């Protein structure tokens, strides 16, 4: 017997029993975004490696350690580790943002070579939003308000909380970086080798360290908010005022910097403790210099991404009231040579006139007992039974499989009206 080929570590299949919840969440995301007037875009999964190096930053963990990169002839390519860089590349290349505001969204798989754990995989899925050409804090507020609405739609709003910060301009951040490095140089004895490397290459990333001893020291470190330029300070104050007025609760977290180099001014994360240790469900911020950095005209940008695996786990954990639609509403069983054609014609008629229903026709043979077992297995609500006599009399037997009520015989001409009443 040939050896089974297994899925790659950290890359998972989605089974028929799991996919309805995924579809339910994805549809909620689509509907909320449509309600705010956002347009879907679709970008390639593979991009040129320099795109991510320039956008995300050479010294970030994502670029230096986590990307799936390969050579195609003389071109270095990478499976996308996130969606913003590719969306900005497409917006520049296709002219979507030339003298134009854009509110865009996308959904799909991303790839990072990191240690697989609950809710974090090597192939994972994100829904992302990118807004271009709007410098005002009102759009930052809209993105946060939009996500808050989505959490209510998903029934998880009581289990997520918003953390907010401003990391200012590049110049303000450079001044803060110098002050932070000067402070941390007195505490290198507490640092791991990796943290010492970060101190040299990307010191702001030390702010979100998991090192407990270093966390305590950081409580006395210089605060980024104290180094903000006037424009960033005013932008952040107006954002906070809008969120207060809209009743959006938040915590200003001075250690929040996000893991990608392109951010400036506003950064935010929605976090949860419902999955064990605190985890990020959604994160984003402003990236006003990224379009120009990647070769476009100076264009402000702001966006966020949410991890769908984390959302699936969170919804499963805290929302037990979901009524997921069944894949099969009506199961058509039949027996007899003449009944086969009649069954297929009837099923097609239902699909045409009641397209919201899932209709499955039995195709694997067997007696009625076997066919009903299959109908039960797929959890159909209604079974329609057609035999030779039903074909002759142009009737159909309707059996409610969920209630166990007595089966009824109805004219085939009345079937659509009867199903409309029941669904």
Curated annotation (Swiss-Prot):
GO terms for biological process: histidyl-tRNA aminoacylation. Homodimer. One of its GO terms (cellular component) is cytoplasm. Its main location: cytoplasm. The keyword Cytoplasm applies. It is found in: Cytoplasm. It catalyses: tRNA(His) + L-histidine + ATP = L-histidyl-tRNA(His) + AMP + diphosphate + H(+). The gene is hisS. Keywords: Aminoacyl-tRNA synthetase, ATP-binding, Cytoplasm, Ligase, Nucleotide-binding, Protein biosynthesis. HAMAP family: His_tRNA_synth. This is Histidine--tRNA ligase. Belongs to the class-II aminoacyl-tRNA synthetase family.
């Amino acid at each position: 017997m040939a050896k089974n080929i297994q899925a790659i570590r950290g890359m998972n299949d989605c089974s028929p029993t799991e996919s309805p919840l995924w579809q339910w969440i994805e549809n909620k995301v689509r509907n909320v975004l449509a309600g705010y007037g956002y347009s879907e875009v679709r970008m390639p999964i593979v991009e040129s490696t320099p795109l991510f190096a320039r956008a995300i930053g050479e010294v970030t963990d994502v670029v230096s350690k986590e990307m799936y990169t390969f050579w195609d002839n003389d071109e270095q390519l990478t499976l996308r580790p996130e969606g913003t860089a590719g969306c900005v590349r497409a917006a520049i290349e296709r002219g979507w943002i030339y003298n134009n505001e854009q509110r865009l969204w996308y959904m799909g798989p991303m790839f990072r070579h990191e240690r697989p754990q609950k809710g974090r995989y090597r192939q994972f899925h994100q829904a992302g939003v990118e807004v271009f050409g709007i410098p005002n804090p009102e759009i930052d507020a809209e993105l946060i308000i939009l996500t808050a609405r989505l959490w209510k739609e998903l029934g998880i709003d009581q289990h997520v909380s918003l953390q907010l910060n401003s990391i200012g301009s590049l110049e303000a951040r450079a001044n803060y970086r110098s002050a932070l490095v000067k402070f941390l140089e007195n505490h290198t004895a507490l640092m791991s080798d990796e943290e010492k490397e970060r101190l040299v290459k990307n010191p702001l990333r030390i702010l979100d360290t998991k090192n407990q001893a270093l966390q305590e020291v950081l409580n006395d470190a210089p605060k980024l908010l104290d180094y903000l330029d006037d424009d960033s300070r005013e932008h952040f104050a107006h954002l906070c005022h809008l969120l207060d007025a809209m009743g959006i609760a938040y915590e200003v977290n001075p250690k929040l910097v996000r893991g990608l180099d392109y951010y400036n001014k506003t950064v935010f994360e929605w976090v949860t403790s419902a999955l064990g240790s605190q985890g990020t469900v959604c994160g984003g911020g402003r990236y006003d210099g990224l379009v120009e950095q990647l070769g476009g005209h100076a264009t402000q940008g702001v966006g966020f991404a949410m991890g769908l695996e984390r959302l699936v786990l969170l919804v499963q954990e805290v929302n037990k009231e979901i009524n997921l639609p069944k894949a099969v509403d009506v199961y058509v069983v039949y027996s007899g040579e003449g009944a086969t054609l009649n069954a297929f014609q009837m099923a097609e008629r239902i699909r045409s006139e009641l397209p919201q229903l899932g209709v499955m026709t039995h195709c694997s043979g067997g007696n009625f007992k076997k066919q009903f077992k299959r109908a039960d297995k797929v959890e159909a609500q209604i079974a329609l039974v057609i035999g030779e006599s039903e074909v002759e009399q142009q009737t159909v037997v309707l059996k409610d499989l969920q209630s166990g009520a007595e089966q009824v015989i109805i004219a085939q001409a009345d079937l659509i009206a009867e199903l409309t009443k029941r669904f």
